[in-house]
């Protein structure tokens, strides 16, 4: 067979373990895996690199269109360039922050139009479950190709902005789950108790307690666990498949494992920042590290890592949710925007912290960044290095420490809690459907080969 390109000399993570094999690429697909595949028009030398499936980040916020309200936030151009530089070849875009929120056919088509010609990586879409669009919106989104749905139990959205996202009440959650169950797709849920966290935050602010530690204390662990239990009950009642996003506590994971044992179709993810940062250092870092649910105590880090390593947590995401710098420029944690810019530093941080520091097998690494999200969200052509799959790869150089600087970031706004951190591995090349979209020496390709899925 004549290949368009062949990857040679790398340690390739396959589904049955890592091997020093060659990978032949034809028409954007993996066409062969083996030894001595021959020559081709192009040889991609992976010497010194670990070749992994490109990351599928299942939790990313892009704010385009901005609707005249958020036009200066992260858009498709910079967001997907950062993804490429970070080894992310596909991400699933959340239905909020953009204006209007993605809740029906009109809004998702507006989003597709806004992103046309701007994508460096592939982008799948979430549709939103909101109280104001329970009459037809879910079905319209299904017809327009969303891979899953998303709702919030925590308070969200700006009521002064027409068409902005809104959290669900119990009836909207129940009715939405019944409708989504009929599509066969997954409902991903931000599980925090809105009434309690809002009130505790209000009390702390009135008492002048505005530090990040006070913010964390206003969102205690039980305010994650309680809504997870409710979601499990609703899932049993409606038959809706569910997924808990950005889980930050071991107790919540354990509730999900119990439900799985009872036959509930439920999974969960955590985020890189919950496996890296900890409460005791937050005020030193500043509001750039504020997120929801909050980052918890250092004593919980290994408990969360153990649940990643044993498979209780299915995969890891960034929950990339950047904003303009002014929304982080405050000493009042309750007033700062709650979101972390982390899309570019999933692969390197997770490889360093998981593989290099905690002896995570390479097959498990590939599973948590690519294979498992591909399976959960039915991205059938993605997620593993196997014949017939899309030729999506990230090349990782192990034991290659570097200090992240602001100028290294491809985001629109160069703000991230990872700035100044020494990271012990590097992404050196990213390939999307056979096309090199990032190379450490050449930089990010200006060729916009990404596309919306489907």
From Swiss-Prot:
Catalyzed reactions: (S)-allantoin + H2O = allantoate + H(+)
Keyword RNA-binding belongs to the record: no
Sites of N6-carboxylysine modification: 150
Cofactor, how bound (note): Binds 2 Zn(2+) ions per subunit.
One biological process term in Gene Ontology: purine nucleobase catabolic process
PTM annotation, UniProt: Carboxylation allows a single lysine to coordinate two zinc ions.
Annotated positions binding Zn(2+) 1: 59, 61, 150, 319
Record EC number: 3.5.2.5
Keyword Metal-binding attached: yes
SUPFAM superfamilies named in the record: Composite domain of metallo-dependent hydrolases (SSF51338), Metallo-dependent hydrolases (SSF51556)
PANTHER family: ALLANTOINASE (PTHR43668:SF4)
Subunit structure: Homotetramer.
Name listed for the protein in its UniProt record: Allantoinase
Species name: Bacillus licheniformis (strain ATCC 14580 / DSM 13 / JCM 2505 / CCUG 7422 / NBRC 12200 / NCIMB 9375 / NCTC 10341 / NRRL NRS-1264 / Gibson 46)
